[in-house]
Amino acid sequence: MPELPEVEVSRMGISPHMIGQTIKAFVFRTPKLRWDIPQKLKKLEGQVIRNISRRAKYLLIETDEGTAIVHLGMSGSLRVLDADFPPAKHDHVDLKLTNGKILRYNDPRRFGAWLWSAPNEPHAVLGHMGPEPLTEEFNADYVAEKAKGKRVAIKQFIMDNKIVVGVGNIYANESLFKSRIHPTRPAGKLTKKEWQLLVENIKATLEIAIQQGGTTLKDFAQADGKPGYFAQELLVYGKAGEPCPECGEALQEQKIGQRNTFFCGVCQK
């Protein structure tokens, strides 16, 4: 599943080809992904793309007349191609530009989304979100205050978009291991020093993943079609039964909040 680094890598990859260009047309090869594809997106035809930004795991393609909002879902990816490049299986949406290029959206599992919002009217999916993890607003003081009295497992806590956006399963596992914090620890029981370390490791892990082009486990590809290389940096995710890179004990796996969780029962307390 594409997480924040993968979405940011996609944004960085498509932006140079699209900002300042004019939208010629949309092509929809399916009426529905996770939700119905709104025909209001066609209001953006003829509009200049002013900016491409990201909020949590959503990409925002901004024009003066509204915004196209893209979510990659479980298996989505975006590529910039020549307009005559033939569509393949699972190529569901094309955004055609007047410069002869297209932004092509591929999504085998169709859990992604294309949405529309009017100018200066944020879409409902972007409401009630916490701060971005790579901003100064996300810091030890902030999360320690939010965690006071909370008994929820720390892994679920840092994956809650109302607390902080975009810390997905892969990066939550990796950050907790680097911080030597057991994923089932109650969030309200962490010390200020542990919060400081965890926040630092979340930021560092996400930044390295972005530099490496994200994590490709199955479907994700960058805008140029290349895979992300952060999978080579993974310490615990997907490695149950393998030796812990620190102590050599077998890494463990269990479900926490319906998500596969990987950790070392010796190193993480």
From Swiss-Prot:
Binding site for DNA: 90, 109, 150
Entry EC no(s): 3.2.2.23, 4.2.99.18
Cofactor note: Binds 1 zinc ion per subunit.
Cofactor(s), by name: Zn(2+)
UniProt superkingdom: Bacteria
Keyword vocabulary terms for this entry: DNA damage, DNA repair, DNA-binding, Glycosidase, Hydrolase, Lyase, Metal-binding, Multifunctional enzyme, Zinc, Zinc-finger
GO biological process entries: base-excision repair
Catalytic site: 2-3, 57, 259
SUPFAM superfamilies the record matches: Glucocorticoid receptor-like (DNA-binding domain), N-terminal domain of MutM-like DNA repair proteins, S13-like H2TH domain
Zinc finger residue ranges, FPG-type: 235-269
Any one GO molecular-function label of the UniProt entry: damaged DNA binding
Annotated catalysed reactions: Hydrolysis of DNA containing ring-opened 7-methylguanine residues, releasing 2,6-diamino-4-hydroxy-5-(N-methyl)formamidopyrimidine; 2'-deoxyribonucleotide-(2'-deoxyribose 5'-phosphate)-2'-deoxyribonucleotide-DNA = a 3'-end 2'-deoxyribonucleotide-(2,3-dehydro-2,3-deoxyribose 5'-phosphate)-DNA + a 5'-end 5'-phospho-2'-deoxyribonucleoside-DNA + H(+)
HAMAP family: Fapy_DNA_glycosyl
Function statement: Involved in base excision repair of DNA damaged by oxidation or by mutagenic agents. Acts as a DNA glycosylase that recognizes and removes damaged bases. Has a preference for oxidized purines, such as 7,8-dihydro-8-oxoguanine (8-oxoG). Has AP (apurinic/apyrimidinic) lyase activity and introduces nicks in the DNA strand. Cleaves the DNA backbone by beta-delta elimination to generate a single-strand break at the site of the removed base with both 3'- and 5'-phosphates.
Stated family: Belongs to the FPG family.
NCBIfam families listed in its UniProt record: fpg (TIGR00577), PRK01103.1 (NF002211)
SUBUNIT field: Monomer.
Protein name (database record): Formamidopyrimidine-DNA glycosylase
Organism of derivation: Vibrio campbellii (strain ATCC BAA-1116)
